[in-house]
């Protein structure tokens, strides 16, 4: 949807600067590009690694109760079935019958009108699953289907017991990792913000059930203060409290930042209850 805080001219300048100075390039550019995928250049990868190192120091190296993990991108597909991703990780999509453009319904100002050409001749909205599918092994059939992970938290839940035993941790403690995630976005846009391959920095904190909200409030405050220490001003940062929760959440907030395209989520803090355990 349109955002009154958006500045398209500034966004255009930012994209041009990033490419010209070697921060971010369109992937596969000499072959026409590949929508939703970006490569980090010499300065971009330095900046990216610096951000990751700062986050890792804050979340892992300075805490005795947070352990690290580096899990695989592809795992047993049963994990994604159990987590609800195969059945519920989707967005509503509609197609314009006039210009053939495809749109995510919740990003349209008017869900009855095509934002590309203005036509009202649209298909009925339908669920579009965001999981990227592949095959493992020499046979391409349903029994060998696998998925690129859509988020980095699920392997943390799967390896929870192994990490706890190996690190000799007791509740409460957390597991953090930095790694790639993949989502088959209907309409990639806003530069690297809404892309199909991206890096996530994630920490899952485990505690007794009755202490869930206490720790949710603790981490909410910790993460807000982290961005304040980095220099984010109150004018350019706000907290969005979710009223409509994801299938796994008991409470959730987003830390939003004012980007050139408007307000967008930089980080989420979610109370997942016992959904994944």
Regions found by a protein language model. Give the residues of each.
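TRNA-recognition modules of translation machinery and tRNA-sensing kinases, especially anticodon-binding
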Residues: 2-277
């Amino acid at each position: 949807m349109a955002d009154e805080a958006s500045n398209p001219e500034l966004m255009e300048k930012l994209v041009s600067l990033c490419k010209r100075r070697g921060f971010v390039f369109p992937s596969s550019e000499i072959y026409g590009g590949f929508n939703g995928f970006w490569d980090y250049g010499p300065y971009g990868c330095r900046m990216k690694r610096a951000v990751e190192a700062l986050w890792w120091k804050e979340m892992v190296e300075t805490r005795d109760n947070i352990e690290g993990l580096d899990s695989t991108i592809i795992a047993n597909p049963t994990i994604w079935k159990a987590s609800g991703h195969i059945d519920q990780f989707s967005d509503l999509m509609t197609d314009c019958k006039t210009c053939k453009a495809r749109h995510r319904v919740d990003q349209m100002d008017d869900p009855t009108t095509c934002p590309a050409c203005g036509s009202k001749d649209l298909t009925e909205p339908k669920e579009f699953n965001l999981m990227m599918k592949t095959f493992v092994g020499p046979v391409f059939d349903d029994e060998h289907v696998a998925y690129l992970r859509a988020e980095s938290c699920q392997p943390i839940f799967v390896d929870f017991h192994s990490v706890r035993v190996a690190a000799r941790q007791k509740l409460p403690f957390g597991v953090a990792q930095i790694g790639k995630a993949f989502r088959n976005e209907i309409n990639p846009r806003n530069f690297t913000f809404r892309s199909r391959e991206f890096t996530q920095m994630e920490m899952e904190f485990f505690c007794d059930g009755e202490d869930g909200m206490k720790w949710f409030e603790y981490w909410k405050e910790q993460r807000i203060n982290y961005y304040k220490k980095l220099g984010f001003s109150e004018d350019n940062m706000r907290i969005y409290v979710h009223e409509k929760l994801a299938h796994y959440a008991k409470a959730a907030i987003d830390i939003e930042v004012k980007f050139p395209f408007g307000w967008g989520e930089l980080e989420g803090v979610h109370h997942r209850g016992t959904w994944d355990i």
